[in-house]
Amino acid sequence: MKVIIVAYNQFELLQMEIEALRLLAGIEERDLIIVDNGSEDGLRQWLEERPGMNYLICDEGGESYSAIVNYAKAEFQIAEDILLLNPCYMILPDSIEEMQRLLYADREIGAVMPKLIYNGSETAGNYTEAVSYIQEGKIAPEVNLQQLKLTDGCVMLKRSMLEKVGIFEEK
């Protein structure tokens, strides 16, 4: 599986996300594709200093999400499942493994999404601290855990579905 993360001025969140993916899902840098969509927060320089990191730079910024995903798929010749992930969402323990299990629970399933907890602009200092906040119930007071909504911030796409669909509509 390849993980595509599109970031725009989310350098610190991206670093936390990469660490969470490594710690909780065993996803290594070679399985990541980071897309900097015109950030001005030092992300580009950081990516250029990491020789094992797969990345794309969209200099103009503001590229459509589907155009970026199409570009990443073509540039890195992705021929496996893809996890599209927004850096402002936190991966919880076992969530990627569970998504993979559900993705292959039926041959007709082409994509799965988890329930997500979005904690606004509040961020923890590191991933361990963030997980502790959730375990202790110290998340944003306005978040109702009984009414979580699905979002496109995290979606896992099956390779066979991607082959059938082809490129994503870029309008």
Pin down the residues of each PLM region:
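Short beta-strand segments
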Residues: 5-6, 34-35, 86, 112-116
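A conserved acidic beta->alpha catalytic loop
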Residues: 36-44
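Acidic/His-rich active-site region of diverse nucleotide-sugar glycosyltransferases
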Residues: 67, 98-166
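Acidic donor-binding/catalytic loop of UDP-sugar-dependent glycosyltransferases
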Residues: 42, 88-102
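Short, well-formed alpha-helical segments that are part of the catalytic scaffolds
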Residues: 10-24
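Cell-envelope/extracellular polymer assembly enzymes that use nucleotide-activated donors
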Residues: 1-2, 31
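Short beta-strand-to-loop acidic/aromatic patch adjacent to the donor-nucleotide binding site
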Residues: 79-90
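Glycine-rich, basic loop-to-helix element that forms the pyrophosphate-binding segment
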Residues: 59-76
